[in-house]
């Protein structure tokens, strides 16, 4: 498992996230690579101390300065021991059977490179579900879907380390590090899949929606469209359609 934490993260939410991938999981991972992205609060430090004392599976990497999510996750992958890596966010909640389901799928279909699932979104209490993001199941459907929208829920994925590295791993791109990676893996003919079940409950709020808007976010979205057009993943008419859709959705 790879996870990154930084100063603006909430210690209570972070603790719940760690609980969901350790104590609450039906299969506890062999390793959790935690990147501390720059200075953090005492509260977050206390959470790290609590879990590293309780579980020897933690490998903590500390960065003096904040480098951003893309670089932090790339570093986490480089320091991962195992070929199968699960992605986890610092304030979300994995369902108890998440790793069990994903490992069983990889055993059944070992040709898979990236495996995700659906997510629910909640505000405040975990039972206060306000949304659900359902993604396509098969490789063919996901690859087609990727031409217009991201076909994987980043917080839910488990992937093969080598397949990610072959595509150049994570690169910084404001709020779009994942989509940018999937596109490059798409071009390397990686095999995608989704389980069709909810794997992660995602904590959302107005702050998240604010960040996923404005000119900075639009520029990162446009960069992805430019990249897909340049390398022949999409046609020019689809490029125009995708840009127009993002303008219409208020991402600028």
Language-model segments: residues:
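A conserved acidic beta->alpha catalytic loop
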Residues: 36-45, 89
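Short aromatic/hydrophobic "clamp" motif used to bind/position activated sugar donors
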Residues: 85
